């Protein structure tokens, strides 16, 4: 059993906060300063503390709507789930570590890595999430007071922030594009793998 990008938090619950945190990805991507007015409108129907059967918790990237402290706490506090591994790029495993997940339960992946779980093969692939690309920290921004102008993050840096996944299963192959933006690189993945179902959030 694999759990992918499960977010059980409520997101923005107030409109009292007017300005984005300095360096917020939406500010860096579009230049806006005011926080979006959207609030999470629907309740989360899945209680993470009711999860009793799972083998891997996967995160595609470290934005808070794809990696959840509540899910990590639920897994870590359930004695039935002491075997569960947390899989994601470097920024995700660092976040899980900060939340108390021990090192021996973390699996850090980068594009090109392959892990196996029983009869499922999981391929970590390049992500095209340009929003994640401009999320701090970005190498060199600390010397520019958090500004990104003139900086070009490397492929290696992007691989530490976000990945897409391909799940090879006996029943077919599932591609998870996470928050990747529209890109001609999807064609590369489509030619590289025989994909039966493709999922994309963006």
Predicted regions and their residues:
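Structural motif
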Residues: 2, 55-56, 120, 172-174, ...
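Pre-active-site segment of Zn-dependent metallo-hydrolases
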Residues: 2-58, 62, 69-77, 131-150, ...
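Short hydrophobic/aromatic-enriched beta-strand-loop microsegments
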Residues: 4, 85, 103-112, 197-201
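Structured loop/turn residues at beta-strand edges in well-structured enzyme cores
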Residues: 49-52, 118-120, 160, 193
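Active-site-proximal loop/helix segments of hydrolase catalytic cores
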Residues: 70, 145-202
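Metallo-beta-lactamase
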Residues: 80, 88-171
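Short, hydrophobic beta-strand segments that form beta-sheet elements in well-ordered domains
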Residues: 85-90, 175, 179
């Amino acid at each position: 059993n694999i759990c992918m990008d499960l977010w059980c938090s409520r997101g923005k619950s107030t409109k009292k906060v007017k300005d984005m945190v300095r360096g917020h990805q939406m500010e860096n991507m579009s230049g806006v300063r005011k926080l979006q007015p959207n609030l999470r409108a629907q309740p989360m129907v899945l209680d993470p503390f009711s999860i009793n059967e799972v083998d891997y918790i996967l995160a595609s990237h470290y934005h808070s709507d794809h990696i959840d402290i509540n899910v990590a706490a639920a897994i870590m506090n359930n004695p039935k789930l002491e075997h569960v591994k947390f899989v994601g790029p470097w920024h995700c495993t660092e976040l899980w570590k900060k939340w108390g997940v021990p090192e021996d339960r973390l699996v850090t992946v980068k594009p090109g890595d392959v892990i196996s779980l029983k009869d499922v093969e999981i391929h970590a692939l390049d992500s095209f999430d340009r929003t994640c690309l401009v999320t701090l920290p970005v190498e060199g921004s600390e010397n520019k007071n958090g500004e990104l102008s003139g900086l070009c993050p490397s492929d290696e840096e992007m691989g530490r922030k976000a990945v897409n996944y391909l799940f090879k299963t006996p029943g077919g192959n599932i591609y998870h594009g996470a928050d990747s933006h529209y890109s001609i690189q999807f064609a590369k993945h489509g030619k590289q793998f025989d994909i039966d179902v493709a999922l994309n959030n963006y």
